Amino acid sequence: MTRALAVEWGPHGVTVNAIAPGYMMTPDNMGNALRADPVQRARFADRTALRRWGQAHELDGAVIYLAGEAGAYCTGHTLVVDGGMTVKI
């Protein structure tokens, strides 16, 4: 969808990008069962190259880049911010 919208809206000067976050430690992601189970939390963390959960603020740079002047020539891109989870697959 990101790529299709980038093609459709590009001629109008609109950039369309996406951010694909990995495991982020947020209240919504840390449900009661996961919050109560440190072993399960560690299993999820071990799936990333950095061996930890991400913090929501670690997405800030990606948002600022894609929304700002530095990312003005970037469109149709999905920026993966996952602590290296996809490189371990």
Outline where the language-model segments fall.
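Hydrophobic alpha-helix immediately C-terminal to the catalytic Tyr-X-X-X-Lys motif of short-chain
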Residues: M1-L5, W9, I19, L66
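Alpha-helical macromolecular-interaction surfaces
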Residues: A4, D60-G61
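Short, small/polar-rich loop/turn modules that mediate ligand/substrate recognition or access, typified
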Residues: G10, T15, C74-G76
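A glycine/serine/threonine-rich, flexible loop-to-helix segment
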Residues: P11, Y23-T48
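Conserved SDR Rossmann-fold cofactor-binding beta-strand/turn motif
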Residues: T15-M25, A67-A70, V80-D82
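A conserved structural motif in NAD(P)-dependent oxidoreductases
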Residues: T48-L59, A70
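Short C-terminal tail/terminal secondary-structure segment
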Residues: V63-I64, T75-I89
